[in-house]
Amino acid sequence: MRFFDLHVHSAFSEGESTIEQLAKRAEELGYSNICFSEYYEGRAQLEKLKAEIAKAQRKTKIEILLGFEARNTRELKRLADIKRMFDVLLAHGGDLRMNRAAVETKEVDILTHPEHKRYDCGVNHIMAKLAKRNNVAIEINFREILTSTKKTRSRILANMRDNITLAKKYKMPIILCSGAISHWELCDPLSMVSMAEQLGMILKHAKEAVSKIPEKIVKSAKERKSKKWIMPGVKTR
């Protein structure tokens, strides 16, 4: 079984560690793929990130992907239009309008921490149905738990449980990510699975959330970069 962590921040965004440090640590922990989530600042930044990833790729066996995390609906639309230029499109969750826009947008791969800074889970039954229809994975973010304390952590855990309950009922995809900003915050995949079980996921679905679900996202990213690709589900001969 291959394991993936598709939401990690390097020093290029809000992170503290280099791409190489994070990639090497992820490889040690048993991951086969890691995706660096950055904030889009333009074409020059994108090319610089690709060069840094290529440099780190030569020093590790793990496959390194590039993702961009949209922070508002305007940024989301812009990134959706240029998605073939990178691998994974993430939407920064928390704001209800952003959460809704993310699950309505087919180009979005992951809605990150939809419960962020909220007193509810950030997703309702309508949004859950949209997430399923558009294959938008709802994230369970380990860092949200790791860096919180007391009542805040209790609220976050309760909100994550609510999203897992919605996922069970409406079949929306759930993905487990570390959300790490340092190579010391990366979490091994089996610990992530164990955490998801404690939140109410059955073992099979918890494993899929760190393997099968992200693998589909990676496969879709590779297909999209093919010269034969026209749109999702449509290719030239």
Model-based region annotation:
Residues 63-74, 92-95:
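A glycine-rich, hydrophobic loop/mini-helix early in the fold
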